[in-house]
Amino acid sequence: MIRILFMGALLMALFSACAGAGRVVSTAGTQPPVITRSYAADKGGYGQTWKIYIEAEDPDGDMVKITSELQQEGVRYQKPVDTIFVKKRDQKYLKGYLALDTFFLREPSFSVSSRLALRVSITDRAGNESKTAVFNFEYTGRTSESTSLPAPFDQGDIPKLGNIVIEGKYPPPRSD
């Protein structure tokens, strides 16, 4: 009898713990992140690292990912979108740069455009998305001279937020 009562009490405790486990208090806010400032060079040489500078804030402090989508005429990318997760310390405010190594992209040719377009947005824990920032880049055949960065990216060390990794599938060679 004592065994039955003990087992019953144990089962009740387990069921009540499981019933409460499904309730999770969401800390996600209702306001989307805002990209307050952004900058990227618009010209450069093939093979150089393209740095995309962004400053963003989220009133709710729950930014979780930065999404980048690359477009280049004449190239069909296997994975045109890349996601970089925001570090916990940067979820309310972030300032830094994304790095895209153009060496791994398709070199411009007769069938591939020398112009790239990169679309960047930030999403928070609730799925709210910032407005998209669009950056255009054109291969010039040589690396660009280093130019001074605009504020606030010219102040001290700017941290790298992550590397944008894009995988390309190139058009087949012409048979003519």
State where each predicted segment sits.
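C-terminal motif of bacterial Sec signal peptides marking the signal peptidase cleavage site
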Residues: 15-17
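Short beta-strand segments of immunoglobulin-like
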Residues: 37-44
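Structural beta-strand segments of beta-rich domains
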Residues: 46-52
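Extracellular acidic, Ser/Thr/Pro-rich low-complexity tracts
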Residues: 55-61, 124
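Aromatic sugar-binding surface patches on proteins
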Residues: 87-105
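Short glycine/proline/serine/threonine-rich loop/turn segments at secondary-structure transition edges
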Residues: 104-115
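Short beta-strand elements
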Residues: 128-174
